Regions:
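Hydrophobic or amphipathic alpha-helical targeting/insertion segments
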Residues: 1-50
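Structural detector of well-ordered beta-strand residues that form the stable sheet scaffold
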Residues: 2-6, 110, 140-142, 167-169
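Short acidic, gly/pro-rich beta-turn/loop elements at beta-sheet edges
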Residues: 9, 13-20, 71, 121, ...
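Intrinsically disordered, low-complexity regions enriched in small/polar residues
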Residues: 20-22, 30, 116, 122-124, ...
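Glycine- and acidic
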Residues: 26-30, 66-78, 172-184
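Gly/Pro-rich turn-and-neighbor structural signature
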Residues: 37-163
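Structured mid-domain segments that build the active-site/substrate or prosthetic-cofactor binding neighborhood
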Residues: 145-149, 156-185
Length: 185
């Protein structure tokens, strides 16, 4: 049995793919930005679901910025990021209903709570996060490590009944700051 999953490639499309398909005259536009290039990004996801949605998948939902960055960057407010991610999830769920199965509950979906995404899930004292959002009903929430093998977060008692359940992302190797390591060579 082999299980492979692209953890941060929404709607069966890879960021590396976008890098090669983007451009001024591309049907996908030239910016990995859901605000300024909504039509192009939506088309990119749509084509991924048309191509791969008929196969057995765990479809990643959500969006990050390019190269593992925050979706709107650090200058944007927490609320701006959360509102944008809600819009992204709504768009992706609509595409999944259209091209994979109208019954979202029958489609395995996953949101990775990377360090760039985790604050949007929880929110803060003044800003409601995505926790409990209907767009995430049935979505597996993938918890992530801190690049040192420690979980960044665990479900609270109130979260244990989340319909999509939980998964875990764990680095077997990591190349980047603050340190690079490999467990296997």
């Amino acid at each position: 049995l082999r299980f492979e999953h692209q953890t941060h490639e929404p709607c069966c499309r890879q960021g590396e793919e976008y890098k090669y398909l983007r451009g001024k005259d591309s049907i996908y536009g030239d910016a990995w930005n859901f605000i300024t290039n909504r039509e192009g990004i939506t088309k990119f996801w749509e084509d991924g679901l048309k191509r791969s949605g008929k196969f057995e998948n765990v479809i990643t939902v959500g969006m990050r910025g390019e190269a593992d960055t925050a979706i709107l960057g650090h200058a944007a407010t927490l609320k701006d990021n959360i509102d944008l991610l809600r819009d992204v999830l709504n768009t992706q769920n609509s595409l999944i209903r259209k091209y994979v199965n109208e019954d979202l509950d029958s489609v395995p979906r996953m949101l990775a709570l990377y360090k760039e995404v985790e604050p949007y899930f929880y929110g803060d004292d003044t800003t409601e996060g995505l926790i409990g959002d209907p767009q995430l009903d049935g979505v597996t929430l993938m918890l992530c490590d801190d690049n040192y093998g420690n979980l960044r977060t665990v479900p609270t008692k109130e979260m244990l009944n989340h319909k999509g359940g939980y998964g875990m992302y764990y680095h077997f190797d990591y190349h980047g700051l603050p340190i690079s390591f490999e467990w296997f060579n």
